[in-house]
Design a protein with these regions (language model features):
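Short beta-strand immediately N-terminal to the catalytic nucleophile in serine-hydrolase-like folds
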Residues: 16-21, 46
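Short beta-strand/loop motif that positions the catalytic acidic residue
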Residues: 102, 108-111
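Active-site nucleophile loop of the alpha/beta-hydrolase fold
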Residues: 44-56
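Conserved acidic catalytic loop of the alpha/beta-hydrolase fold
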Residues: 2-17
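Mobile cap/lid helix-loop segments that gate and shape the active-site cleft of serine hydrolases
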Residues: 62-100, 104
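Short secondary-structure boundary/capping segments
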Residues: 34, 58-63
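Gly/Ala-rich beta-loop-alpha elbow adjacent to hydrolase catalytic centers
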Residues: 19-29, 33
Length: 111
């Protein structure tokens, strides 16, 4: 994906871009910070998931906590594809991002 994003920038005549990610989309910003720093001018994280993946209580609560039936959290957590992605196919170690890895202007919004 990083190659595709940098190729997209080059195709449009840009060497750098400002990237915005929301929730799961912040994982792509994490990849850009780690593997294509030269293509990143600035970052905007909206409700990021990539910063606290090393805190076991946060990830454990999403994977194992049973929310109240009928709530939005219940619907999201019990969706077959969301459940499979988080429990079986989520690249935790690739997505986690530490502040030291960000070397460009960055803004984080948490809702």
């Amino acid at each position: 994906m990083v190659r595709k994003m940098t190729a997209m920038l080059a195709y449009h005549g840009f060497s750098k871009g400002t990237f915005i990610g929301h929730s799961y989309g912040t994982s792509w910003l994490s990849y850009m910070c780690k593997y294509a720093q030269s293509a990143v001018a600035a970052l905007l994280f909206l409700d990021p998931i990539c910063f606290c993946l090393y805190h076991p209580h946060l990830t454990k609560s999403f994977v194992y906590h049973q929310p109240d039936p009928g709530s939005v959290a219940f619907i999201v957590r019990t969706d077959m594809m969301v459940s499979w992605t988080i429990q079986r196919a989520f690249p935790w170690t690739w997505i986690v991002l530490f502040l030291e890895q960000i070397r460009v202007p960055c803004t984080v919004f948490i809702g």
